[in-house]
Amino acid sequence: MRLRAGVAVDLGTVNTLVCVAGRGLVLEEPSAIALDRDTGRVAAVGRAADALAGKETQDVEVIHPLRDGVIADLDASTAMLQAFLRRARLHRGLLRTSAVVCVPSGATWVER
């Protein structure tokens, strides 16, 4: 069996990396997301969100949604990954794209 992946994603506790076949590493950003406390909308992701950490206003909350290499906040992780894939210009055609997502070897079935 030959594995052909169009996209590889490494959701790390500190950084998230996205690689695309034929393009190489297209995104390396801190695994952080800033959310509007009132609406829940994404205010910033990656470096922009990480820069807000410790400087949050009452309106914005910065979340690092991965802990010990696994997803601790599913909703925030999903929103962050969607934003990263948009930034990497992968928002179109993902239904037909093979993907490899890295997970720690010690992750439980639920964490995977």
Residue ranges and their predicted role:
Residues M1-R112:
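Nucleotide/phosphate-binding catalytic cleft detector across ATP-hydrolyzing
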